[in-house]
Amino acid sequence: MREAIERCGLNLSGLTVLTEAATGSYIVTPVLAAMAGASRVLAVARTNRYGSAEETAAATEALAAAAGQGGRIEYIPEVNRELVHRADIVTNSGNVRPITDEMVGWMKPEAVIPLMYESWEFRASDVDVDACRRRGIAFAGTNECHPAIQVFSYLGLLAAKLLFDAGVGIYQCRILLLCDNPFLPYIEAPLKECGALICSAASASEDIGTQAFDAVLIAMTPRAGAVISADEMCRIAVHSPGAVLLQYFGDVDRDAAAAIGLAVWPEDAPAPGHMGILQSAIGPEATIRLQVGGLKAGEVLYRRSYESDPAAAEYIQPLLS
């Protein structure tokens, strides 16, 4: 964690950070903020399917103590006007969002919102960006390919984990990779190096011939509704009746797939617009890099260092739409 902070030169001194207390590898976020010198760290801890708020706070505090930050984090059950107004950086994290029109109205004008992911991954349900624009609240995504972050370097390993979990051996397996976004080379190259026979396409509507596939790895940009239609799944089922659909990114109509006779992995559907496998599935390092990168984006936005320092500007991605 310290190495990741030092790589990015993350310095939150004098700033109040409102973020989440979470489970799994996402436990690191408020601890990282404290380690980076934030003057105050507010962490929303909520009871959910992963554990109680009390358990989450206790686990986070144990990690904070191990990192020399015991007692630095304030755990809160929910956001409120007073605490949001005190925050300089409000992270777009699970227990904090949705960041609604009302919540944006509570923020002080100089507050900023790091999206905590790349800007093209933006989900409109996360942040009311129209309210942000009206209020002058700055927001931006993280450049996950920045040399000090390099989260994309883990995408191929994550895809391999998803394939292995589904029982697909990768080596000499025929895999149709559906990808229409910057993930493509980071998934494709490592799988090929593992011996997979990859056919890549931007969508299932492309002419992919009549070859049979062992698996269809779906890594499509989320949109309203499913990223692969019932007709497209029917075409796959005709030529690859035993193929498994792997939901890496992008929503899948699982009822339609079942009616067609195609299996979908993972067994439990992710939330709409979310990845089918978390980075924590391959260990904490990728998550640490991602969260430090998101906090760094928040720092750059708040200090407006992107205006005068091209190196600082490389950490953020403006939301264009």
Predicted regions and their residues:
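Glycine-rich adenosine-cofactor-binding loop
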Residues: 13-27, 143, 155-200
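Histidine-anchored nucleotide/phosphate-binding helix
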Residues: 20-43
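Conserved S-adenosyl-L-methionine
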Residues: 35-41, 193-202
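A short, well-structured beta->alpha microelement
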Residues: 64-82, 195-212
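Rossmann-like adenosine-cofactor binding region
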Residues: 79-105, 203-281
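Phosphate/diphosphate ligand-binding glycine-rich loop within oxidoreductases
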Residues: 85-168, 246, 250-258
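Adenosine-phosphate binding glycine-rich loop
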Residues: 140-174, 242-321
